[in-house]
Amino acid sequence: MAPKAAAGKKPAEKKPVEEKKAEEVPAEKKPKAGKKLPKDAGRPDKKKKRAKKSIETYKIYIFKVLKQVHPDIGISSKSMGIMNSFINDIFEKLAQESSRLARYNKKPTITSREIQTAVRLVLPGELAKHAVSEGTKAVTKFTSS
C-alpha cells in the first residue's frame, strides 16, 4: 500500500548537491598568528612517521672513560653492549642493597650514607675503596657548587 500524500502539499524541492555541501561545511579557519600547522596537515593520505623511542644507555660515557684511560684503543659494539649491561646490573644491585638498608633502619629516604654502605657490601675490596673515595669526591663537588 502506498503512503498517503497530504492533499495540497507539494513535495519538498531538492537543492543541488553543491549548494548543500557549501552550507554544511564551515569556512576554513585561518591559523592564528604564532601557531604553526603540522607538516602533514596538507597531506592526509600519507602515513605519519613514528617517533623513535629513546633508549638510555651508558655507551657515550663508557667511550669517554675508555679514551681517558687508553686513547689509542677502540671498542666493538658487542663489547659496548656487554659493558652497558654490566653497569646496569651493578646499579640495580646497589639500588636493591641501599633500599634494603633503608628498610632495615626504618628510614623512608635513601641517602648517600646508604649508597656508600651498599657500595662497600656489593663491591669487593680495593674496588669498593676506590668507588667510595670517588663517590665522596663527587658528592663534595656537588654540594659545594
From Swiss-Prot:
A cellular-component GO term for this protein: nucleus
Position of the Glycyl lysine isopeptide (Lys-Gly) (interchain with G-Cter in ubiquitin) cross-link: 141
Tissue: In anthers, floral buds, pollen, petals and fruits.
Keywords: Acetylation, Chromosome, DNA-binding, Isopeptide bond, Nucleosome core, Nucleus, Ubl conjugation
Positions carrying N6-acetyllysine: 9, 35-36
Localization terms from the record: Nucleus; Chromosome
Comp. bias intervals (Basic and acidic residues): 10-44
Induction or repression: By wounding and methyl jasmonate.
InterPro entries: Histone-fold (IPR009072), Histone_H2A/H2B/H3 (IPR007125), Histone_H2B (IPR000558), HISTONE_H2B_site (IPR055333)
Biological function: Core component of nucleosome. Nucleosomes wrap and compact DNA into chromatin, limiting DNA accessibility to the cellular machineries which require DNA as a template. Histones thereby play a central role in transcription regulation, DNA repair, DNA replication and chromosomal stability. DNA accessibility is regulated via a complex set of post-translational modifications of histones, also called histone code, and nucleosome remodeling.
Family matches, as PANTHER family: HISTONE H2B
Subunit comment: The nucleosome is a histone octamer containing two molecules each of H2A, H2B, H3 and H4 assembled in one H3-H4 heterotetramer and two H2A-H2B heterodimers. The octamer wraps approximately 147 bp of DNA.
Name under which the protein is recorded: Histone H2B
Native species: Capsicum annuum
